[in-house]
Amino acid sequence: FGDELNALRAVVCEAIFNPELYKTQLNQAEGQDLVATSANNYYEGVTQAEAEDFYRAMADPADPEPVSYGLNSKLVKDEDGTIRERVWKVGGMYSPAIEKIVYWLEKAQGVAQEPQKATIAALIDYYKTGNLHDFDRYNILWVRDTVSNVDFVNGFIEDYGDPLGRKASWESLV
């Protein structure tokens, strides 16, 4: 572990102690590349302009129910310059952890009250597909459930760590 540990230590110490490296978690200063000047890992090798262009091309202005494009993904630029999303889902990025989330949601579904069973099923679908329309369906069911004795929040929800307001960190509470 000696060389690996020393290499890791060098990276960590640089990130912690170099005031020029990651000045702020979330830069919102006008006229600057907000992605390049913010300390997060939602965009790998991608500039603010490239990210904005990527999602602008994805959006369908005629869609009556547009989704929050990018909410559950990391945007990366490949060696050949191609920009793509790495979606957080079963079989995608963070799959082992998300598989555990699905496992426990399936357990909870077995003891949930009726309206909540459908809500949990929609959330499981979302984690399996990564499809943001499934996430919207889950959220609509969650909001409509006003009778279940136990409430919960679960998903890639908090977008305040992304300078572009697109990517969300995961949270769960019961």
Regions found by a protein language model. Name each.
Residues 19-174:
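Fold-level signature of zinc-dependent metallopeptidase catalytic domains
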Residues 1-12, 16, 21:
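N-terminal accessory alpha/beta regions
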